[in-house]
């Protein structure tokens, strides 16, 4: 069973069970295998090279799709009433305008927020935790650093963030795919 788990985690999807069993039997009984260890190693190297190329092609296709989807989404948002497009590509809509202090790029802020992917799935929310987040504006994604500086305490904005102002080409493993444009609703509670 351990061998099967190791094979699966290595990405091996297809196995000729007859050949596998014959090779296993030959090794365990001391018989001469049909394929030498050197040939088996070369076959595995070839298999893994093909698997890696396939995975790379899939990742490139997914990345291209994410970029196109993000560009289309942002182009549509840019046409909506009330949406402001900044030179950086960051877009926002004022939901509520506050009248308190505005932060600088190096200030710490207390915010409530909710982040979603373009398909609407939520990947993070301080509202769900029922606890505002505190962070330095120089310690977050560039879209947040730029966008939150536009807000006054008491404001609530919706940001539409292109991938290059979010998590970029790498994404955030397990939560945000590479090249993902994001939507954030941010409520600036306090500049600290």
PLM features: residue spans?
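Cross-family detector of peptidyl-prolyl cis-trans isomerase
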Residues: 1-192
